[in-house]
């Protein structure tokens, strides 16, 4: 069939991959297509395993084109020092913030990471956690259905901190949302709150339902990590 590549033929595969690289470069740098640049990154990572070059394309596509998913991936590169970049959490935070503010497949995860870095505090000027900023970005991510953000919010309101008072109503609200999204410990925490009447009306029946959900999620998680067996 005309145009089909025989992937058993080494020469055809080599030619196909070379053409793909040329095409990706053309779309990125000649047609100024941000999605084309991101496809070039996929090619460099997945086919060439050239992470240094991928980092350069990501920097270009994030800084020049404000491409959300490129900013997210560049942030991840900065977190680990991948692609020849110097490990830099502040640079990572800036990248995640750009990704959070622009629509993209990774926008919600980027908002969570902004919250996470603000919560950790290393990227802040005083080196201390910025709980207000963490709350704001966790909330954005949680509203987008990001489970870990909902759980982190529940923990923040459950524990409280100087300048960040406890709020058991909100702790319960976010525990329930994280539980609905499948977070085991959120279900367990919500169950305990209802069992003890800790900040909410005591409801042992609801506590039991939540405990059972936590146990079911735990069983499902255990099934997911069972080793393969051959009989």
From Swiss-Prot:
Positions annotated as Sel1-like repeat: 34-66, 68-104, 108-146, 147-183, 184-219
Residues that bear N-acetylalanine: 2
A Gene Ontology BP annotation from the UniProt entry: respiratory chain complex IV assembly
UniProt function note: Required for assembly of mitochondrial respiratory chain complex I and complex IV.
Subunit comment: Interacts with CHCHD4/MIA40 through transient intermolecular disulfide bonds.
Impact when changing residue 149 to I: In SCAN3; uncertain significance
Signal peptide: none
Protein name: Cytochrome c oxidase assembly factor 7
Disease cited in the entry: Spinocerebellar ataxia, autosomal recessive, with axonal neuropathy 3: A form of spinocerebellar ataxia, a clinically and genetically heterogeneous group of cerebellar disorders due to degeneration of the cerebellum with variable involvement of the brainstem and spinal cord. SCAN3 is an autosomal recessive disorder characterized by onset in the first decade of slowly progressive distal muscle weakness and atrophy and distal sensory impairment due to an axonal peripheral neuropathy.
Gene from which the chain derives: COA7
Assigned protein family: Belongs to the hcp beta-lactamase family.
Superkingdom field: Eukaryota
Organism for this UniProt entry: Homo sapiens
Subcellular location: Mitochondrion intermembrane space
Transmembrane segments annotated in the record for this chain: none
The keyword Acetylation belongs to this UniProt entry's keyword annotation: yes
């Amino acid at each position: 069939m005309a145009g089909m590549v025989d992937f058993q033929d080494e020469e055809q595969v080599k030619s196909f991959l070379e053409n793909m690289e040329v095409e990706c470069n053309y779309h990125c740098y000649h047609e100024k297509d941000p999605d084309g640049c991101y496809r070039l990154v996929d090619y460099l990572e997945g086919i060439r395993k050239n992470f240094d070059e991928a980092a350069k394309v990501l920097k270009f596509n994030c800084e020049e084109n404000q491409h959300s998913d490129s900013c997210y991936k560049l942030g991840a590169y900065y977190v680990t020092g991948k692609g020849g970049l110097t490990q830099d959490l502040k640079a990572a935070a800036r990248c995640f913030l750009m990704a959070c503010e622009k629509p993209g497949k990774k926008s919600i995860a980027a908002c969570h990471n902004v919250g996470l870095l603000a919560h950790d505090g290393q990227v802040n000027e005083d080196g201390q956690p910025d709980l207000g900023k963490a709350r704001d970005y966790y909330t954005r991510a949680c509203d987008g259905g990001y489970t870990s953000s909902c759980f982190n919010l529940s923990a923040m309101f459950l524990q409280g901190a100087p300048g960040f008072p406890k709020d058991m109503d909100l702790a319960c609200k976010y525990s329930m949302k994280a539980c609905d999204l499948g977070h085991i410990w959120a279900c367990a925490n919500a169950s305990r709150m209802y069992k003890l009447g800790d900040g909410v009306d005591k409801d042992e029946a609801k506590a039991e339902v939540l405990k059972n959900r936590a146990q079911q999620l735990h069983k499902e998680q255990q099934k997911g990590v069972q080793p393969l067996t051959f009989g």
